[in-house]
Swiss-Prot record:
GO terms for cellular component: blood microparticle; haptoglobin-hemoglobin complex; hemoglobin complex. Heterotetramer of two alpha chains and two beta chains. Heme b binds at residues 63, 92. One of its GO terms (biological process) is hydrogen peroxide catabolic process. Gene3D superfamilies: Globins. PANTHER family: HEMOGLOBIN FAMILY MEMBER, HEMOGLOBIN SUBUNIT EPSILON. This is Hemoglobin subunit beta-2. Belongs to the globin family. Red blood cells. GO terms for molecular function: haptoglobin binding; heme binding; metal ion binding; organic acid binding; oxygen binding; oxygen carrier activity; peroxidase activity. Keywords: Heme, Iron, Metal-binding, Oxygen transport, Transport. Residues 2-146 form the Globin domain. The lineage of its organism: Eukaryota, Metazoa, Chordata, Craniata, Vertebrata.
Length: 146
């Protein structure tokens, strides 16, 4: 993947302004509520019986933060995201058996959550760069499934 200087700046700018403790949980909670079938991977996380239960679940919140921090690896290795995520792809496919379509669902929920937080600053150009970044991450996480 080729990144322009502008794309790199936009992506790094988004993450430099993020409150991981806020955005990570909100994105994962949104995914689990909007796409309830994704909850099947979180059975050990406790009560997921309602939107309120999911929203108040501390294990879900902590995992949302972990997922968001996991994107830091991609930020640090933007020119080699596929290789950077090779082990995570194996983990999610062979150990956790996560449906790779769920990566895109979470990416969409993350985009919505960040756009809501950034408001008018989340311009179409910002979305283009961010979408490209997440598409590469989603592809890398799903690579083991091919």
């Amino acid at each position: 993947v080729k990144w322009t200087d502008k794309e790199r700046a936009v992506i790094l700018g988004i993450f430099s302004g993020l409150d991981y403790e806020d955005i990570g949980p909100k994105a994962l909670v949104r995914c689990l509520i909007v796409y309830p079938w994704t909850q099947r991977y979180f059975g050990a996380f406790g009560n997921l019986s309602s939107a309120a239960a999911i929203s108040g679940n501390l294990k879900i919140a902590a995992h949302g933060v972990k997922v968001l921090h996991g994107l830091d690896m991609a930020l640090q290795h933007m020119d080699n995201i596929m290789e950077t995520y090779a082990d995570l792809s194996i983990l999610h496919s062979e150990t956790l058996h996560v449906d790779p379509d769920n990566f895109k669902l979470l990416a969409d929920c993350l985009t919505i959550t960040i756009a809501a937080k950034m408001g008018h600053c989340f311009t179409p150009d910002t979305q283009i760069a961010f979408h490209k970044f997440l598409a590469v991450v989603v592809s890398a996480l799903g690579k083991q499934y091919c």
